[in-house]
Every structure is written in C-alpha cells, then in structure tokens.
Amino acid sequence: MGRVIRAQRKGAGSVFRAHTKKRKGEPKLRHLDYAERHGYLKGVVKQIIHDPGRGAPLAVVNFRDPYRFRLSKQLFIAAEGMYTGQFVYCGRRAQLQIGNVLPIGLMPEGTIVCNLEEKTGDRGKLARTSGNYASVIAHNPDTKRTRVKLPSGAKKVLPSANRAMIGIVAGGGRIDKPILKAGRAYHKYKVKRNCWPKVRGVAMNPVEHPHGGGNHQHIGKASTVKRGTPPGRKVGLIAARRTGRIRGGKGDEKFKEKEKK
C-alpha cells in the first residue's frame, strides 16, 4: 500500500457538513403555532432571490407577528408561479392557491404540493429540489393519515396534520441546459461541495490509488472488495452483490434497440 489515498484523506466518514458561506439562510415553513392550527396568517412576498448552491429560487415572505406588534421575515422555497407582491396564506383556513401552506389532510386528492413535512411541525423535508413535487393520493379520516406520492415514485403514508406548500418547486428543467465548459462546472461545485474535479483511480500512479499504474489504464484485478477491507484498499465496488449489465431488464431492451438502429 502506498500513500494515504483520497478516501482516507476525507476523514469525515458519513457525516456531511453543508457549505453555508454566502448562503441566504435555511428555507423552512413557519413554526407551527396556534394561529396556523386554528386559522391562517397572511404574508407578502417581498423578493424572489437566488441562493448560491441551490437550484430553486427562494421567496422572502414578510408575516405580521400574531402575538407582537412587529413583522417577521421568513424564507420559503419558491413555488412555480409565485411573484413579488403576492399574498401568501398559511394555516388550516387558507385557500387552495399556489404558494399557500396548509395541512395535507384538507387538500383534495390529486393536489400537487412541495416542501412537504415528514413529521408534523418539522417545517418541510420532502420535495424541495427545483422542479420537484409530491401529489396527494388518498385520505383515511379514521386514522388521520394521508397517502402521498413522492418525487421518486414511492408512496408514503403521512399524518394528515403535516403541512405542505401548494405547487411545484420553481426552477424546473435546470439540468436540461448543458454545462459545456469546465469553468461553469468549477463555479457550480465551488459553492456546493469540494469534490470536483474527481480524478479516476486508473489515471493515478500506483502509490496514490490501488487502481493506478500500468502501461495502459486498466484496473488489473477484480474491482470488488469486501465490506471489511482496510481503508487504504477499500475502493471500487464495495461489497457488491452482483456486477455487470442487468440482462433482461429495461436497460437491456434500450441497448438492443440502439444496436438495431
């Protein structure tokens, strides 16, 4: 084994610390209080802003504090169709309009929502990426649970008291535009994380990576490794159940169609 490899130098394990420099703030729903549980609050969208490192724009919404004579500023993930000067209503008595926040149990089946709470009062955890949305499928009034279809296609049963914003997250189609230049990729990943550019192991020297070296770029041995492999050797396909192309599936059918063409 040669030098300390890249996977060892990272050293933080599975703990991810988000880059917060230049960020505008953490966009969340309002704290769940008495006003939202029994009525509604009215807010005004003051500004639509860009948050570095985030694909979706943010909406700066000013609410009048229900308990004190002051305004409270809140950052929301902007839904598609929101605009400056729009009135936003939060609470169980709010109307079904884009940008409004209300419990999913009060929404009709088929409603498109975003920034959905996973647990009641957690201020939004699901369907927050640009262009993403979840849809309300069915309600069970006996158990006070609601069935929701998530952006991944998975169906999840959540408490009907969980809140969500009506609409689709703005910024959809962002990944359709090609990056084209390495300079753009540099600026993109600089604010998101520090893993770019990522050099392939086979392009390194043998002291820098287990896959490095050779007269041409090849791994030279099986790329699968055990789960308990020591850190300097634990690269490649870790504890793989199987390798190679999946035959007989959707991917294989697409490959055969390309061959025919």
UniProtKB/Swiss-Prot annotation:
Q: According to its UniProt record, where is this protein mainly located?
A: cytoplasm
Q: Where in the cell is it found?
A: Cytoplasm
Under SUPFAM superfamilies, the record lists: Nucleic acid-binding proteins, Translation proteins SH3-like domain
Q: Which domain of life is it from?
A: Eukaryota
Family matches, as InterPro entries:
NA-bd_OB-fold, Rib_uL2_dom2, Ribosomal_uL2, Ribosomal_uL2_arc_euk, Ribosomal_uL2_C, Ribosomal_uL2_CS, Ribosomal_uL2_dom3, Ribosomal_uL2_RNA-bd_dom
GO CC field: cytosolic large ribosomal subunit
Q: Where in this protein does the record put region Disordered?
A: 208-233
> Which Pfam families is this protein grouped with?
Ribosomal_L2, Ribosomal_L2_C
Q: Work out whether the entry's keyword set contains Cytoplasm.
A: yes
Write one Gene Ontology MF term.
rRNA binding
**Which Gene3D superfamilies does its entry note?**
2.30.30.30, Nucleic acid-binding proteins, Ribosomal protein L2, domain 3
Mind telling me which PANTHER family this protein's record contains?
LARGE RIBOSOMAL SUBUNIT PROTEIN UL2, RIBOSOMAL PROTEIN L2
Q: What is this protein called?
A: Large ribosomal subunit protein uL2
Organism, by scientific name, is Anopheles gambiae (African malaria mosquito)
